[in-house]
Every structure is written in structure tokens, then in C-alpha cells.
A protein has these predicted regions:
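Short loop/turn elements that form and flank the Walker-type P-loop nucleotide-binding site
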Residues: 75-76, 168-170, 199-202
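Hydrophobic anchor at the beta1->P-loop junction of P-loop NTPases
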Residues: 82
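N-terminal pre-P-loop "Q-motif" helix
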Residues: 58-71
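Alpha-helical sensor/transducer elements of the RecA-like P-loop NTPase core
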Residues: 3-4, 11-46, 50-54, 66-67, ...
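Walker A (P-loop) ATP-phosphate-binding motif of ABC ATPase nucleotide-binding domains
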Residues: 79
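Conserved phosphate-binding/catalytic loops and adjacent sensor/switch elements of nucleotide-binding enzymes
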Residues: 86-88, 92-172, 181-183, 228, ...
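Walker B catalytic acidic pair
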Residues: 177-178
């Protein structure tokens, strides 16, 4: 179940194993979400604050500094992809990264209903407003008028990209968690593609999900600006297995036993 590697060689290459990483602890909010319930949004539906707040593990099973370091080394890329099935600790790793990075982070937890372009753009505006207060007022106004005045998707997206281009400079990571739930939406794919092409230079996207996103990124890949972590990278290395059992489970294993765990 290994994916094709698009990134530079990883340090401390993980052992080959088909056994997934030990399930990680569920991330918790690092600060109270902006909303405890749904907040009315000008586009006509409610924004759920817990879907767009940064998160980090309250209690990780095991810190993974080699992967956090890998992230830090690749934040100058335009697109970072995390691709693995459930249970490999993708969200926990993103939480650990978000607490270590100096970059500002927008974290959007996706559901299938977010495949609607109005919903998707509305949440992006709300998330980016946590980074840039007052962001996207003109985009919001157009979203509000989609039904009343028939604002087209292209007009709204053009305004959104214009708002992005005029935003305050700085390093910003936009995390789209569980991206596989909306990857089938042509509208979402188009919006993400335009963001990759037109967003400010300091902004990069992190797509985390099951499988490789359906995006045309050949030009960016040719420029070395697409990086990927797959199942092989997310598996525990032998030293990580040894530390996990010794420090978390209180059951130290010898090297042979660690190898058995890795090969299960």
C-alpha cells in the first residue's frame, strides 16, 4: 500500500510494513473555537466554528519530530499532500506541526457537504478572517447575492482571489483536512487549482486525506513545489516503536520484538 514518492528522500526511512501506524490520539482545540454553535453567515447558511479552528493533539501517543521537521523543511512549497488511510496519524501530525510552526495556520475540516462551492468559499473566507481580520468582505457580499442577484461562480471566485492578492503579506498554511471527501467536486478542484496558481507567494496548501487528490499540478511538480507524505513515511520507524513501547506503554521491547511489531 505504498504511494509514489513525490518528495525528497526522508530522513530515517521507515521500516517496510503493511501494518498501519498505531492510531493517534484525537486532536483537541488549542484554544476555544470562535463559535460554540452555528453562526449565521451572509451567504445564507450557518458557519460552524469548530470546523475552521486550529487544532493540536492534547496528548499524542508519540511525538514525531522527524515528520514535523520534514514539514518545516518544505513550507516553501506551494502544495503539501498527506495521503494515507485512516489510522496513520495524519490529523495528529498536522496538529503537532501547527503548534510548532511560526506560520499562521487556517485549518478547515471538510465534510461531503463542503463540496458545494458556496459552502467551500464561505468557510475559506471565515477561516482566513481568523488570520486577517476583516478579510473577504467583498467576497462575502457576492456570496450573499448569489441567490438574490445571480452572482456567478467565476465572479465570486475572481473577487476571492483579488481579496487574497491584497491581503497582508506573511506565511500562511491552509490545511484542508479530509480532502478526499470533496475531491469528487469539480467546483472544489477548480477553486483549489486557482488558489495554487494565484494565491500570495507566502501561502501554501496542505491537503490531507485518503488517496492522491485529483488535481493537475504537473507544472508545480516540475518546479519542485509539490511535496508528499504517504503511508511509507507515516509508518513508525524501529526507534519510534522502541520509544513508543518504553515511554507510552511502559513495556520496553528488545530490537527483535520491535522488528516483529514493525512487520505485523
Amino acid at each position: 500500500m505504498s504511494g509514489r514518492r513525490d518528495d525528497a528522500a526522508m530522513p530515517n526511512q521507515p521500516v517496510a510494513s503493511e501494518h498501519p501506524a498505531v492510531p493517534a490520539a484525537t486532536p483537541q482545540q488549542t484554544h476555544p473555537p470562535r463559535l460554540n454553535a452555528a453562526e449565521p453567515h451572509p451567504s445564507g447558511f450557518a458557519i460552524i466554528g469548530s470546523k475552521i479552528g486550529p487544532a493540536a493533539p492534547a496528548r499524542s501517543i508519540l511525538a514525531r519530530p522527524r515528520l514535523v521537521e520534514w514539514f518545516e523543511q518544505h513550507t516553501r512549497s506551494r502544495l503539501i499532500i498527506l495521503s494515507a488511510e485512516a489510522g496513520y496519524g495524519k490529523t495528529t501530525l498536522l496538529g503537532e506541526f501547527s503548534t510548532h510552526t511560526r506560520d499562521r495556520v487556517v485549518w478547515y475540516r471538510l465534510e461531503r457537504s463542503d463540496g458545494d462551492w458556496i459552502t467551500f468559499l464561505s468557510y475559506l473566507v471565515a477561516g482566513l478572517r481568523d488570520v486577517w481580520p476583516g478579510f473577504g468582505r467583498r467576497t462575502e457580499a457576492l456570496l450573499r447575492n448569489v441567490a438574490a442577484m445571480g452572482s456567478s461562480r467565476e465572479v465570486v471566485l475572481a473577487q476571492f482571489l483579488s481579496d487574497l492578492s491584497s491581503a497582508e503579506a506573511g506565511r500562511v498554511a491552509v490545511i484542508l483536512d479530509d480532502y478526499h471527501l470533496v475531491d469528487a467536486s469539480p467546483d472544489v478542484r477548480m477553486i483549489v487549482s486557482r488558489m495554487l496558481e494565484r494565491a500570495p507567494e507566502g501561502m501554501y496548501l496542505v491537503l490531507s486525506g485518503r488517496g492522491t487528490p485529483t488535481l493537475s499540478v504537473g507544472r508545480l511538480r516540475g518546479q519542485g513545489r509539490v511535496q508528499k507524505l504517504s503511508i511509507d513515511d507515516l509508518r513508525f520507524t524501529l526507534p519510534e516503536i522502541e520509544k513508543l513501547f518504553a515511554t507510552t506503554y511502559g513495556q520496553p521491547l528488545d530490537s527483535d520484538a520491535c522488528q516483529v511489531v514493525a512487520e505485523r
